Every structure is written in structure tokens, then in C-alpha cells.
Amino acid sequence: MNIGKYIFAQVIDFIPRYQFDKLVKKYKGDWHAKELTCYNQLLQLLFGQITGCDSLRDICMCLEAHNGILYHLGIRKYVTHSSLSRANENRDYHIYEELGMYLIGIVRPMYSNTKVAEITIDNVLYALDSTTISTSIVLAAWALGKYSKGAVKMHTLLDLRGSIPANIHITDGKWHDSNELDEIVPEPLAFYMMDKAYVDFLALFRFHKADAYWISRPKDNMRYEVIDHRHDFDPSTGICGDFTIKLTTHKSKKLYPEPIRMVTYHDSETGNDVEFITNNLEISALEVANLYRHRWDIEVFFYDKYIVMRSYPDCNTDNHGFTELLLR
């Protein structure tokens, strides 16, 4: 009796097989492969992600238990835990990274006109942040973190129109967040929202010269002088001040010689005054505050996706770790 197509089989129909096979050929992923091809590896890891398996061993046991229907799921054959682990270690993770970027390139235009709450401008909006995943430095020596601990960082540039990652960069835990700005090609007229950890005036000035806009918060040790005041704001909205400032220390004003805008906002929920800095002098002060508030959308994204490496005890190489992270 035909009961229809399994949901998992319907999901994997969206994988562009032609493009995937091109990437496998490019990176020689199926070199000497017999039963566990790159495509079969991809399906098994996706199966584990969708079904909430906690480790590679769980994936293999679950697939073995459903051996009779694997063909209908689109999976050729289940493999042992050791075979799947070796495939993750040895097959170039760039295969799955470039597949992900290809799919993102298809999906992002579909949401390019999505409205963002309380935002009136039509510019491209990005939120930049990272999430840190703890691991054992003994079992994953490649994942160096602070204080002799193991950690991996996933730096994500999130397109706020649709909450779709525009770029993902995986590093060890010692990679400072501000270094990530050097990995990004600024998009003219786009807004980049980031917290104060990303305040690197040399990198931010590069964004400014590329006609891209950034919004962040000042560090506690930032020294500046006020050179202009603006009064075109409604205090009832929470805006307390709108200034144009200039950096005063020798190093900072050399790195960023142009004026910067500073907006002060009173948060009625916490009772605190919050300061924002930006290179955009045109939008309203309230728009600046609302844009930065949407930086929290990326925190929600990390929480919703539950970015954890459940099977990190298996990840004894960076290639293994990157492969599993990219497929989660």
C-alpha cells in the first residue's frame, strides 16, 4: 500500500544535486569512496539534525533500527559510527560550506523586501555577532580557547530581513570578534549592527569609506569631544541626546579621522541610559536606537537554532568539527 512520500525524503528534494555533485568533484570528496559517498554522508548528518540525535553513534543506531525504510528515505545504507566519523574527519568541509552559501544565495532574495518591526528604511540590514561553543581541549586540541579551555566560535552575519545568515565563519575560541570585520566586504548603503566588542576604528573607517553604515556602542575608555548638538528628536520616545563627536586620543583620531554620531537613549524598562555610535548622520535618532535593538535578533537566532556541538567528543580534527557545525 502506497502511503505517500516520507517527510525526510520530501525535504532532501530541495538539495540541488547537480551543484552538490560539482562541489564533490571540485574537492574530490568521493575519492576511493564505496558505500559512504558525500551525498550519503550529508543525508545521514541531516537526518541526525532533524531528528535531534545527540551524537554520531545515535545517528547510526537510529538508521540501523530503520534499515527497512532507508531506501524510501533516500539513504542508500546505514554505516558504522567509525565510518561516519572518518568521513567527517577526512572529507573537505568546504563541500558543505559552499553548498550552504549556494542555498543561502537562492533564499535571501525571496525575503529581501521583508519588513522589520519599527524600521522605516529600505536598506539591507545586518546583525553581526558570534556564539561560543565550549569543548574539551584534550579531545579537541585544535579548538583553542581562553584560559587553557577548548572553544569554537561561530561568527554569523545575519540578514535581518528574513533572519537568514549571509555569512558564517568558524574559528577557534581565541579569535577576537573585532578581527571578523576584516573578513567582511562592506556592502554600500547597508547597515551593520554590532556590539562594542567589534569596535575597531581602523576596520570601521574602512566600512565608512565603502559607503556602508555601522551602528555599535562605545567602549568605556573611548575619549571624544562633542562638536555639534542636534535637537530634532522627541524626548517622549526615549531619546535623551543626539550629538556629533570627534575622537580625541592620538591613535583613535588617526584611525578614524571623520566625525561620529552619538545617540543617547533612555530605556524605561531598566532605567538606564544607553549610548549608540554610528557613522550615519541622516536617519532619525530613534531609528538608530531601533536598529540597534534589532541586533538582538541574532541572539534569538542562536537560541532558536540551539547551536551546540552535541557530538564534540568525536571531533578530534578541525575539519570534523567544521563539518558538523555547518550541517547544524
Each model region followed by its residue ranges:
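Extended, structured, electrostatic nucleic-acid-contact surfaces
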Residues: 66-74
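Short, surface-exposed helix-loop/turn micro-motifs enriched in polar/charged residues
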Residues: 55, 73-76
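Active-site- or DNA-interface-adjacent structural scaffold in DNA-acting proteins
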Residues: 76-141
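Extracellular beta-strand-rich solenoid/capping regions of secreted or surface-exposed proteins
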Residues: 143-145
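Single, function-defining residue in the core of a domain
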Residues: 1-58, 62, 91, 98, ...
